[in-house]
């Protein structure tokens, strides 16, 4: 659809908006990168120039997340869904059971894959609180005594649910942070494994980050393919096979951009301001509603419904004409969804709220 504005704000849940400065830099370097006369896509992943890209990206990510030295940072392929299989195959060791916390769609997607490799002890953490959807405090999660690890998804993009606490357990905690990594400060040392598909807050689709504590590298199943084996990837510095070099390069540019914004602490303040603005307007309105309790509302993904669902298509059409794109909710829940990852400026959320006010005034 043709837009009636030169400014477009992309609320896609993923692949998501990249920082404009990153895209402009990549555009400027695309044909002649680093004065080599070729694109970064065209050089060997084992060449010194690309090894410098890889090392710089890892160093910046370690700085941004304060990753301790006893963790490996792996740049993997296959996205988070590959990690749904990689996690049990890497971490079970001699165990046969793992606990998975169910708080939404992606947590259960991980469960379905893990069931191929182990007995999955599922704990349903979803509850109703004050008429809204919420999640039990992590202190109340039931974790099996014989579990090799406990897995959860801190941010559910479809449901718009965020979990902000961790259980106290001696089991390794594994977190699918695909949609929340780098959006807020975390203590990496409290986790055994963190993994995240790139296409939300890291870079373009095609690469996945895994942060793995060293003591968990020797538990892999003999059946585990080499491309998913954390120890092999660590030993080969994520170059066991040819990696997605352009996605790796772009992710490195995003890390540089984020450091220039002041790092994760600074971007978290912006993210909280964006979320407060949007949720605040939704809560003040009788025309829009959000079904998630404030204790567990996602900073990154804001689903909302109109009081008149028959107006959904009209809302989307008029929003797109205003340069507010990719607001259609996931098919599982319907309605609308505004994904407001790190690259979404506060001005974009303000533009959305202004449009929502105008739409309500006209159609309520």
From Swiss-Prot:
Any coiled-coil regions, as ranges: none
Binding site for L-glutamate: 46
Reaction catalyzed: O-phospho-L-serine + 2-oxoglutarate = 3-phosphooxypyruvate + L-glutamate; 4-(phosphooxy)-L-threonine + 2-oxoglutarate = (R)-3-hydroxy-2-oxo-4-phosphooxybutanoate + L-glutamate
GO biological process per UniProt: L-serine biosynthetic process; pyridoxine biosynthetic process
Amino acids binding pyridoxal 5'-phosphate: 80-81, 106, 157, 176, 199, 241-242
EC number: 2.6.1.52
GO cellular component, one term: cytoplasm
Pfam families given in the database record: Aminotran_5
Primary location: cytoplasm
Cofactor note: Binds 1 pyridoxal phosphate per subunit.
A single MF term (Gene Ontology): O-phospho-L-serine:2-oxoglutarate aminotransferase activity
Pathway(s) this gene product operates in, as recorded in its UniProt entry: Amino-acid biosynthesis; L-serine biosynthesis; L-serine from 3-phospho-D-glycerate: step 2/3; Cofactor biosynthesis; pyridoxine 5'-phosphate biosynthesis; pyridoxine 5'-phosphate from D-erythrose 4-phosphate: step 3/5
Alphabetic keyword roster: Amino-acid biosynthesis, Aminotransferase, Cytoplasm, Pyridoxal phosphate, Pyridoxine biosynthesis, Serine biosynthesis, Transferase
Family statement: Belongs to the class-V pyridoxal-phosphate-dependent aminotransferase family. SerC subfamily.
Function: Catalyzes the reversible conversion of 3-phosphohydroxypyruvate to phosphoserine and of 3-hydroxy-2-oxo-4-phosphonooxybutanoate to phosphohydroxythreonine.
The name this protein goes by in its record: Phosphoserine aminotransferase
